[in-house]
From Swiss-Prot:
Sample GO molecular function, one term: purine-nucleoside phosphorylase activity
Keywords associated with the record: Glycosyltransferase, Transferase
Gene3D superfamilies: Nucleoside phosphorylase domain (3.40.50.1580)
Protein name: Purine nucleoside phosphorylase DeoD-type
Function text: Catalyzes the reversible phosphorolytic breakdown of the N-glycosidic bond in the beta-(deoxy)ribonucleoside molecules, with the formation of the corresponding free purine bases and pentose-1-phosphate.
A Pfam family of this chain: PNP_UDP_1
CDD domains the record matches: PNP_EcPNPI-like (cd09006)
Listed PROSITE patterns: PNP_UDP_1
Bridged cysteine pairs (disulfide): none
Binding-site positions, phosphate: 20, 24, 43, 87-90
Residues at the catalytic site: 204 (proton donor)
Length: 235
C-alpha cells in the first residue's frame, strides 16, 4: 500500500492507463478489459486491473492538474514498479485545423506550472514522451484510419484564465492544445527512468467555442482509449 493507493503488491500491472476522471477509469475497465478487479477506491480515485487482448494492464484515475497526477505517478512508480504510463484525457484545441474529437499525441509539453522551475532553478526543463510508446500509439491510430496529430501541448495550471493572450501566442508557435497534466507525467517518467505518453482527445476548441458534453467526455472517445491500450500491451 501507498498513501493514496490501497493495492497490494502485484495487483497493478507494469503498463497502466491514466485518465484524470475516475469514472472514465471505471468505463475503460468495464468496456475494454476482461477479468477485471478493482484495487483502489481511496478518495474515490478508482483503479482497476484486467486483461486486454490477453495481456495484463491497469487503469488508474489521477484527478486534475499537475499536483494530483504527480501524487499517483510517484506512488505507482515508487511503490508498485509501474514501467509504462499512458495518460488518456481531454484537451482544448488552440489551432484552427485541430477539430473536436481529433486525437493528439503529445510529443512534449510546455507549461506555466512552477513544478519544474522548483526542481531546476534558473532552467526550463523540456520533458518529452517515450519515443517507442509514441510510435506504437501513432501507428495504432493510423492503422485505424484516424488523423492523429503529434506535437507540443500546453500543460496549464489554470482552467479559468482571465486572459487568453498567452494561449494565443503559444498557438502562433505551433502548440496544438491545452491540458493540465502531461508535463508532470513526462518529468516524473524522466526522473525515474520509465516510459510515459499522453494520448488526448480534443473535447472543445478554445477559440471557436465548439465543445462536447461532460457525459460524452466520460463515456466516449473510444478511439483514444484503444490507441493507448494497443500501445501499452506492446511494451
Amino acid at each position: 500500500m501507498s498513501v493514496h493507493i490501497e493495492a497490494k503488491q502485484g495487483e497493478i500491472a507494469e503498463s497502466i492507463l491514466l485518465p484524470g476522471d475516475p469514472l472514465r477509469a471505471k468505463y475503460i475497465a468495464e468496456t475494454f478489459l476482461e477479468d477485471v478487479t478493482c484495487y483502489n477506491n481511496v478518495r474515490g480515485m478508482l483503479g482497476f486491473t484486467g486483461t486486454y487482448k490477453g495481456k495484463r494492464v491497469s487503469v488508474q484515475g489521477t484527478g486534475m492538474g499537475v499536483p494530483s497526477i504527480s501524487i499517483y505517478v510517484n506512488e505507482l512508480i515508487q511503490s508498485y514498479g509501474v514501467k509504462n504510463l499512458i495518460r488518456v484525457g481531454t484537451c482544448g484545441a488552440i489551432q484552427k485545423d485541430v477539430k473536436v474529437r481529433d486525437v493528439i499525441i503529445a510529443m512534449t509539453a510546455c507549461t506555466d506550472s512552477n513544478m519544474n522551475r522548483l526542481t531546476f532553478p534558473g532552467f526550463d526543463f523540456a520533458p518529452t514522451a517515450n519515443f517507442d510508446l509514441l510510435k506504437k500509439a501513432y501507428d495504432a491510430g493510423t492503422e485505424k484510419g484516424l488523423h492523429v496529430r503529434v506535437g507540443n501541448v500546453l500543460t496549464a495550471d489554470v482552467f479559468y484564465r482571465e486572459s487568453m493572450d498567452m494561449v494565443k501566442k503559444l498557438g502562433d508557435y505551433g502548440v496544438l492544445a491545452v491540458e493540465m497534466e502531461t508535463t508532470a507525467l513526462y518529468t516524473l517518467a524522466a526522473k525515474y527512468g520509465v516510459n510515459a505518453l499522453s494520448v488526448l482527445t480534443v473535447s472543445d476548441h478554445i477559440f471557436t467555442g465548439e465543445e462536447t458534453t461532460s457525459e460524452e467526455r466520460q463515456t466516449t472517445f473510444n478511439e483514444m482509449i484503444e490507441i493507448a491500450l494497443d500501445a501499452a500491451i506492446q511494451q
